Regions:
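A short, N-terminal "cap"/entry segment at the start of jelly-roll beta-barrel domains
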Residues: 18-67
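Histidine-centered metal-chelating micro-motifs
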Residues: 80-81, 100, 116, 120-126
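Bacterial N-terminal signal peptides
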Residues: 8-17
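Glycine- and acidic-residue-biased ligand/ion/polar-headgroup-sensing regions
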Residues: 87-90, 94-99, 104
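Conserved short histidine dyad/triad with adjacent acidic residue
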Residues: 69-86
């Protein structure tokens, strides 16, 4: 009888561990964090005084010890990221839409599949073009808080 109860108890403990919440909100070493657009979306003006309205998605902004920034931004028609000097390497990747990027005074079109690396000391800005939102991913090294 005792062995049967012990087996049932161990089975219940194992089953309960399967239904514990995953490490979504409090990452542990070797853990992970899952975030979705709907959870992090914020309507914001165009960054760096770029004008217009954008939707910013700052993924993993509260992740302790994370040394990089990973964002998505949807630039609505007429909006942009203002021309500014870059302080660290920054990568832009166009998911959808069209835009015009200006780096160090030279302008060029960006379309889906375009990746741009801006280096420290360069200056750049980005304007949405056309009727569709310009959706981009942005990745750069986190500055110490």
């Amino acid at each position: 009888m005792f062995k049967a109860r012990a087996v049932v108890f161990v089975g219940v403990v194992i089953a309960a561990s399967w239904f514990q919440p995953s490490a979504v909100s409090k990452p542990q070493p070797g853990g992970y964090i899952v975030e979705r657009d709907a959870d992090v979306a914020r309507t914001e003006p165009g960054t760096h005084k770029g004008g217009g309205e954008t939707v910013g998605y700052s993924f993993f902004a509260k992740a302790p010890g994370l040394k990089m920034v990973f964002r998505k931004r949807a630039l609505q028609p007429g909006s942009g990221i203002g021309y500014h000097e870059q302080k660290e390497d920054e990568i832009y990747y166009v998911i959808s839409g069209r835009g015009v990027m200006t780096i160090d005074g030279k302008s060029f079109d960006v379309t889906p599949g375009t990746a741009v690396l801006t280096r420290p000391g360069s200056s750049h800005g980005l304007k949405q073009a056309g009727n569709e939102d310009l959706v981009i991913l942005i990745n750069y090294e986190q500055t110490p808080r």
